[in-house]
Amino acid sequence: DMYYFRLQELVRKEICRDLPSVVSISMSNLERAQKYFMMVAESAPLRPKSIDVTRKINMLRQQSDSLLRFFHDMRLIYYSADQLGTTPAKQKVFMGDTNLLISFFGDKENRQLMCETYFLSQMRSVANVEFMVNGDFLIGGKYIFAVGDPLRGYDRLRFVPDAYAAIYGLPKSVFNRMPAWILGFSY
């Protein structure tokens, strides 16, 4: 599709144009930055392993951390800032929105990842979003959201105060479960 090709081209141009204005970077490192972005896109929702980054594009962890911050500031990706201290294998990194996810990742069939990416793109515009250890999301330090599959068990949230489930494919809200699309009205 031409739209997604154009979006990829636009992102590559932005990286080439904006990154040198923020940090002094050589042309070879600029190419590595683009390759690293592609690695991040392909490994979403997990951060690429440091050993893979070192082997494939010869980049140190400090460099990859600073590039992650840059991509986050450009809103190309989203990660929770409190995760940078943890090991990279456990860090979650999502694409900035579903258009970027489809454009670079290409997997429209991974509905769980699509739903989580959509959820993040909607909620981070109105509140701080943190990732919880169990895979849920903490919104604004108060609300807990489980995001995803309608067949997944959400009974664990039933008696937890301020806990909700954003579910794709759900036609209407029932108790603390809501359709994921309704979050589009959050801003």
Predicted features and spans:
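Accessory nucleic acid-recognition modules appended to NTPase machines
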Residues: 1-133
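Nucleic-acid nuclease catalytic cores
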Residues: 140, 162-173
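Conserved catalytic cores of phosphodiester-cleaving nucleases, focusing on short active-site segments
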Residues: 123, 135-153
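Structural signal for conserved beta-strand scaffold positions within catalytic alpha/beta enzyme cores
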Residues: 95, 131, 146, 165-167, ...
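Structural alpha-beta junctions
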Residues: 126-128, 159-164
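A structural signal for short secondary-structure junctions
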Residues: 87, 138-139, 158-160
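Domain-level recognition of nuclease-like catalytic cores that cleave nucleotide substrates
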Residues: 171-187
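Active-site-adjacent loop/helix micro-motif of nuclease/hydrolase catalytic cores
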Residues: 105, 110-114, 150-159, 173-175
